């Protein structure tokens, strides 16, 4: 019996070590013991859920050795006041499904790392997509600078690596434009805004999709990518792997939204109609960086506060 218990412990340690190597995680000896224990706790939760759940979880992703409380501290796109903005009804019949990835209009998955900069990744992913759709270009090489927005949008109401809103990013781009990644590389840290960087793209405005209106969000997605915000605080979201995600504990009211992402389409997954949502946590999280979120019931608030840039242009 003792030998069997030892074998279980070794197997678990190997699993943890493999995860740490894959995710480039390094810990002190004492911290490693704690992280392994959390990893094993999460692995047990994943195994239990996957036996009964309608979608799949995994401990492959970057947050497998974090408690849910620790993970939630990373979610920085929080709202303290109601936002106003131009709301537009498209009033068009959207197609049954849309997936801009299949059209080559979605740039590769990015990784925001430990910086609370999701608001820059969600908003710029939508801008990149709409530039590709409306003005052309190569999805594999188009890369706008999130660092530019992290460092330079404080006067617009954002807070660097401690969170912000995509609408503030768009306000900045309307006036100043946004640089290329190669001219203003991502460091995932706060620093002073560089004012001598050449802008590569600009917008003339942005539009808010009518709140909680799934038909209008589909219509907006039929024309291009949309910046959306969600409640990502659940352990199930933290450890999501694949399938049609839904969670009754997840909130969809405006002030519960805490993570900004980008919707790239919608379609049927495992028999359920879902939004196709692009995250900014690298390809190791979720379904190669994506999550399929059930449309019915406005899961986690996808349709609560969507917006997209207008008048997109290269400079």
Curated annotation (Swiss-Prot):
Single GO MF annotation: cysteine-type endopeptidase activity
pH dependence: Optimum pH is 5.5 with azocasein as substrate, 7 with Z-Phe-Cit-NHMec, and 9.5 with Z-Phe-Arg-NHMec and Z-Arg-Arg-NHMec as substrate.
UniProt GO cellular component terms: extracellular space; lysosome; phagocytic vesicle; plasma membrane
Cellular compartments annotated: Cell membrane; Cytoplasmic vesicle, Phagosome; Secreted
Keywords in alphabetical order: Cell membrane, Cytoplasmic vesicle, Disulfide bond, Hydrolase, Membrane, Protease, Secreted, Signal, Thiol protease, Zymogen
Domain of life of the organism encoding this protein: Eukaryota
Propeptide part(s) removed at maturation, as residue ranges: 14-93
Disulfide bonds: 115-161, 152-193
Reactions the enzyme catalyzes: Hydrolysis of proteins, including basement membrane collagen and azocasein. Preferential cleavage: Arg-Arg-|-Xaa in small molecule substrates including Z-Arg-Arg-|-NHMec
Active site per database record: 118, 259, 279
EC number: 3.4.22.35
Membrane topology: Peripheral membrane protein
A GO BP entry: immune response
InterPro entries found in the cross-reference section: Papain-like_cys_pep_sf, Pept_asp_AS, Pept_cys_AS, Pept_his_AS, Peptidase_C1A, Peptidase_C1A_C, Peptidase_C1A_papain-like, Prot_inhib_I29
Signal peptide: 1-13
Record Pfam families: Inhibitor_I29, Peptidase_C1
Activity regulation (record text): Inhibited by cysteine protease inhibitors ICP1 and ICP2. Inhibited by leupeptin and such inhibitors of cysteine proteinases as L-transepoxysuccinyl-L-leucylamido-(4-guanidino)butane, peptidyldiazomethanes, iodoacetic acid and chicken cystatin.
PANTHER family according to UniProt: CYSTEINE PROTEASE FAMILY C1-RELATED
Described function: Cysteine protease which degrades matrix proteins such as collagen, laminin and fibronectin and thus is involved in the destruction of human tissue. Can abolish adhesion. May play an important role in pathogenicity.
Oligomeric form and interacting partners: Interacts with cysteine protease inhibitor ICP1. Interacts with cysteine protease inhibitor ICP2.
Family that this chain belongs to: Belongs to the peptidase C1 family.
Protein name as annotated: Cysteine proteinase 2
């Amino acid at each position: 019996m003792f030998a069997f218990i030892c074998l279980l412990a070794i197997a678990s340690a190997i699993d943890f070590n493999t995860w740490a190597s894959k995710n480039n995680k390094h810990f002190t000896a004492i911290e490693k013991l704690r992280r392994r224990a959390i990893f094993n706790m999460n692995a047990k939760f994943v195994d239990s859920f996957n036996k009964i759940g309608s979608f799949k979880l995994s401990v492959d992703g970057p947050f497998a050795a974090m408690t849910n409380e620790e993970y939630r501290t990373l979610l920085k796109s929080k709202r303290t006041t109601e936002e106003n903005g131009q709301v537009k009804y498209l009033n068009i019949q959207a197609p049954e499904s849309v997936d801009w990835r299949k059209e080559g209009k979605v740039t590769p998955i990015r990784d925001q790392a430990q910086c609370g900069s999701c608001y820059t990744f969600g908003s710029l992913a939508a801008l990149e997509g709409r530039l590709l759709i409306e003005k052309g270009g190569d999805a594999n090489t188009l890369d706008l600078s999130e660092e530019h927005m992290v460092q330079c949008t404080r006067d617009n109401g954002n807070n660097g690596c401690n969170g912000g809103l995509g609408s503030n990013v768009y306000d900045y781009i309307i006036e100043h434009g946004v640089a290329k990644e190669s001219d203003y590389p991502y460091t995932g840290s706060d620093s002073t805004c560089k004012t001598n960087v050449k802008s590569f793209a600009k917008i003339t405005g942005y539009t808010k999709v009518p709140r909680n209106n799934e038909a209008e969000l589909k219509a907006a997605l039929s024309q291009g990518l949309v910046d959306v915000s969600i409640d990502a605080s659940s352990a199930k979201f933290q450890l999501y792997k694949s399938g049609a995600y839904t969670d009754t504990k997840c909130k969809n009211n405006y002030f519960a939204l805490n993570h900004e992402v980008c919707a790239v389409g919608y379609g049927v997954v495992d028999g359920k109609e879902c939004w196709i949502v692009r995250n900014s946590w690298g390809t190791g999280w979720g379904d190669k960086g994506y999550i399929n979120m059930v449309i019915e019931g406005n899961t986690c608030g996808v349709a609560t506060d969507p917006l997209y840039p207008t008048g997109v242009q290269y400079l």
